[in-house]
Amino acid sequence: MRKGPFVGLLGVLAGALVAAPFAFAGGTITGKVTFSGKSEEKEFLFSKFPNPKFCPKNPHKELVKGEKRILPMIEVKDGGLKGAVVAVADIEDKAFIDSYKGTDVVAEFCEFLPYTGVVVKQKNFHVENHDADPEDPKSVKGVLHNPHSFEVLGASSSTVFNIALAEKDSKLDKPVVLRKDKQGSFFRLQCDQHEFMQGYYLPVSNPHFAVAKEDGTFEIKDVPAGKHKLVVFHPGSGKGMRTEVEVDVPEGGKADVKAALK
């Protein structure tokens, strides 16, 4: 049967629709976050905090030095800064925000994990206590942790939630309430029982973010082509103030970024 022009046109349109996702495929941002200084850490005596026999059992041995708990504030390897959060800041993705399930943090051997990450405004922040000490009658059912969260901007800090988790497997699930995120605030977590338990999280509004690896390198895939503003955040650099970097992402290609923090 002879095909008319309308049928042929439908075929062309169908082909165009199938090809569309590939035609508008984004690009990739790769790079390295560098730090001009040296590694820095804080020291805490276990004896000054609850559970001085349990907390030193942390399997991350680099965090335990005899009777002291080490909190790495800045970790530098070959000039690269571990744990920096890099995010595209000029895209608000409603679908991502609506579908975001929340930020998950665990308290494990007196450590909040992950140490750095992201949060989404008004979406939930989950903390689960994994700790119990069968050798301590007071902590058999659970090591008491008290996750206390803050919104921080410069010298300003305000409580978001402050909830005790007394037993193993106890959880909290609270929305991230931010009032100064447009001004550059970040979300801070600290245990009121164990000061060395800390975590820091950057507010984001799209899925285009990454946490720098041990050597400071990162990769963000599927970023819409065009010019974008990146923000780079690390709690130990510049008192947590964000550093901005401009990047031009090529269609289907890569843009390499060098972000230098001080």
Labelled PLM ranges:
Residues 1-4:
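Positively charged n-region of N-terminal signal peptides that target proteins for export
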Residues 8-20:
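Bacterial N-terminal signal peptides
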Residues 24-262:
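Extracytoplasmic copper-binding redox domains, predominantly the cupredoxin/blue-copper superfamily
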